[in-house]
Amino acid sequence: VSQPDSTSAPVADCYDLVVIGGGINGVGIAADAAGRGLKVFLCEKDDLARHTSSASSKLIHGGLRYLEHYEFRLVREALAEREVLLAKAPHIVKPMRFVLPHRPHLRPAWMIRAGLFLYDHMGKRKRLGASRSLRFGAGSALKPAITRGFEYADCWVDDARLVVLNAMAAREHGAHIHTQTLCLGAKRVGALWEVEVQHADGSTRTVRAKGLVNAAGPWVAQFIKNDLKLDAPYGIRLIQGSHLIVPRLYEGEHAYILQNEDQRIVFCIPYLDRFTLIGTTDREYTGDPAKVAITDQETDYLLNVVNAHFNHQLQRSDIFSTYAGVRPLCNDESDNPSAVTRDYTLALSAAHGEAPLLSVFGGKLTTYRKLAESAMAELKPFFSQMGGSWTAESTLPGGEDMTTPQALEEALLARHTWLAPAIAQRWARTYGSRVWTLLAGVEGPQDLGQAIGAGLFAREVDYLREHEWATSLEDILWRRTKLGLFTTEAEQNTLSQYLEKATQRSHAA
């Protein structure tokens, strides 16, 4: 099976834009630019969504707590984006109700009501319901002392798949997407950038471009200093956010937003039917962003917040898995990590006649599409042929010809009556209408190939290698699917062996 776009562009080809970074902002900009007719080359040193973009709380949300920091522009933009992304990717984005237990000594009821009133009215709502007050009865999962609360709507998203789908959209508009490709350095030569990149096999090439976008996330400032030999216009603050995954903590498909004594909030979110996701933390991080991991202090912090609210008391032994990431936020000199702005800053540098450099500082998953539109507005003076904005009305791959995941699931089971319902459900919520590409030519279970485990078959692995840049076990089990939580060590070994053979076959071909 060939890797998509691994060697599709000749050496020293000239592009309009080279994008550094395969996180949500990089692929969002690549897709937007390619759809406007620009010729785009994106390189990512690891896998798509390998770092910050797969370590989020997996929410598309307005950011209720940002209202306390008066970030009205960010909240308004984020609220509006919820409905846009629901329509763009109905297979991986879903509405979710959030329950906020009232703790009067932390925030008075009038303050929460005022915040929710703004939340309801600042963004256009079509599918998302309004907020309301709640009273908790005897059957509540919360402690008896917590009798009142509030409920409002936001959305959940599969964060890593949002990145992959944007990369696919970019490719379908002509962009060249190269994973496992490190940028060794770049320099301005006349009116162009010359960018040297190194592929996974060690081979190097030079790519020329009229513009360079630095969307390196946690490495954005480091890239400017070390690889471009320039001065970074802003400092970056790395704020670590860690999460726990525990067995399902309560019944229902709603999330909880818990207020802690330190004025921070922590989410408890239903995850993959069997689990509850708990997070996040906020702590300054000064190490290598690639090596971030949850600390004992963070683990205790999250357990304590949850145990202060729920009847069911969690212990360390209940933790099924953890993950951590760093948010690369623009340094606004705030003393409190929680108060550092989540808004984005775009820094354009281009003296007269120079090829432009656009660097992305900060940003959040929810507003990636608006960030990309803003990036295009910054670059417009350098690309007179650039088309207009288009991403608000377009679906992401898999969102085409789709009403709901449930309807797609039913169509899958009607056409393939032998298919296990759990697999049909997972495929509908993972691939959307692209599941028909995955199943092209499949008449019966024998056509799915080798059974690897947890509902994963060779056919799906081949699809992910061919269409979604997946090369490793981790790419497949943790980012393209979430089957890492459901597979045994033996099943993971089976997958590793299958991938090894598949790689050998593709090299032989």
Language model segments and positions:
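Glycine-rich Rossmann-fold phosphate-binding loop(s) that bind the pyrophosphate
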Residues: 21-23, 45
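C-terminal catalytic lobe of FAD-dependent flavoproteins
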Residues: 153, 159-162, 169, 228-277, ...
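Glycine-rich FAD pyrophosphate-binding loop
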Residues: 34-55
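A conserved short coil-to-beta-strand element within the FAD-binding core of flavoproteins
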Residues: 179-193
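Dinucleotide-binding Rossmann-like beta1-alpha1 core, especially the glycine-rich loop
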Residues: 58-139
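Flavin (primarily FAD) binding-site architecture
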Residues: 214-229
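Extreme N-terminal leader/targeting segments of oxidoreductases
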Residues: 1-17, 32-36
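Core beta-strand elements of the Rossmann-like FAD/NAD(P) dinucleotide-binding domain
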Residues: 13-15, 202-211
